Amino acid sequence: HDMNFNLKFEKLNKKNYQRKHYGKILTVRLPCNPIFPIGPIYLADHIHKCFPNIKQQFIDLAIIPINKVSKYLARKIDQFRPHLIIFSWRDIQIYAPVDGRSGNPLQNSFEVFYSKNILKKIRGSWGGLKLIASHYGEIYRNTSLVKMGLKRAQKYNKNVKVILGGGAVSVFYEQLGNLLPKGTIISVGEGENLLEKFIRGDSIEEERCYFAGQKPRNKLIHEQPSGTVKTACNYQYIKSIWPEFNWYIEGGD
């Protein structure tokens, strides 16, 4: 009888431990075009509705000058010391250089394939190369930010976890597994259910995600997402966890 009670007590403790475990969650939108970060905001709002006791902070690296991004992220992590960091990677940018030439990747490849004019051919492939280089540059930069964020947060909580999701991830999720620290959760799709289960300590096997260092399930991207009921976003709450909220409302810079 006594033993049974102890077992129950341990279970209870374990549950509480898990709750405490993710007491602080930092959501980071990785650099991209500064468009209002509706996706990650909905996530933060959803977490707050499910777990009102969890402390959250939100940072949007899209509005930070690119040469200050790394320092800014490090400072935020030092101040907040999160147990879980969610990185949202909106899309892979297509940077048009100043001369505007490398604008359209499809246009470039078509020019290469179909033009008789050799100069045009060279220009086409050069545009494509520039574009590929900027993709790689961005992938390198963002994966470096994730690695740095994890390392920094581990100084304060050695069991800190990282989840990476967003539009770009859905596109090349298979390649990311090798570029990120082992154990990073790579999420394809929305992420609300995944986060809810993860914070509760439930199994996330059914969710559209996989751990860096393991192989993703075959055709992961084509699995049906499990629906979540969308509710109105509590913008008062969002303002409280994201000091720069008004940057967008006031029309940028």
Which residue ranges define each predicted feature?
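Acidic, low-complexity intrinsically disordered segments
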Residues: 1-253
